[in-house]
């Protein structure tokens, strides 16, 4: 009995010591270390002993962009005419009560299983708040365009739309699936003065040169402009954690950082894709990613651990990758229900505009269990600050 008591005390001490912080890195740079108490004080939107997990609030069913089960049309070859796969929310600069979502759909009802070559970019709108529901507004690209990321460049006074893919004018007679070996993803950018277009022709900025060690896919852009430094420089993060910068959105993109860890796929616990990169209010850098850990450890299972968080004081590193979950595929809803999705990928955040860079919403492409083509875009609020944001816009309960 005495031995058991001593062991319990030691385990408690060791656990408490393990949770202590010494530097802000111990708080994932998502908060500050209160050294007097050796505990982390997390920024809004983040929770956990090390502030490494998103504080996700319940989502509302049938918000986001969720039209995957609408009936197919006469020109569709399959049954998923409005399946979508993730996207990014942009608040209208002229009418703050209007929100835009840039996402992808799949032509001819081919759904997610036919993403290459059937994926194309659309713009959807919500007039009922940032959570949606969003409704189709217009088509932005031809096939094949996928994985869009859109940012506003204050220096250029333009919207910059990055995506992967190539324009393809083939007349389809059936749903197809084309491998990477035939169609490299590549990364291109288009620009517009207005979020409703017109959009300039896509210009390729990075090609998928695997022999050179670059897999150009999954773009995530961040303009470096600030009021103190009104630069036109752009940061572009891509899969396998390669980070590029360009002096302007039209300039040459030069490699500034490559992951120091093993980025090979399949058996690697650090395997990620779909980075979403940003700079916080302290000037530190972060990304959330689709983490493939269960695929590696559980015989290609795609759930429930799906999100990772990486951070660094400088863009050029060192970047810290804690092998722990930042979010899962288990989603709780406002009706009291919950659901574990088979896939939850393409994470992107919508931040507060007050300079605090508080994450208010996360978007993902999600797919239910036992599905292959049906998918939709989920919007989930984060923390509690989103309530004030919506209230100031006149949305939500009084």
Q: Model regions: which residues?
A:
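Carbohydrate-active catalytic/glycan-binding domains of CAZyme proteins
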Residues: 20-398
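Cleavable N-terminal signal peptides of Sec/SRP-targeted secreted and luminal proteins
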Residues: 2-18
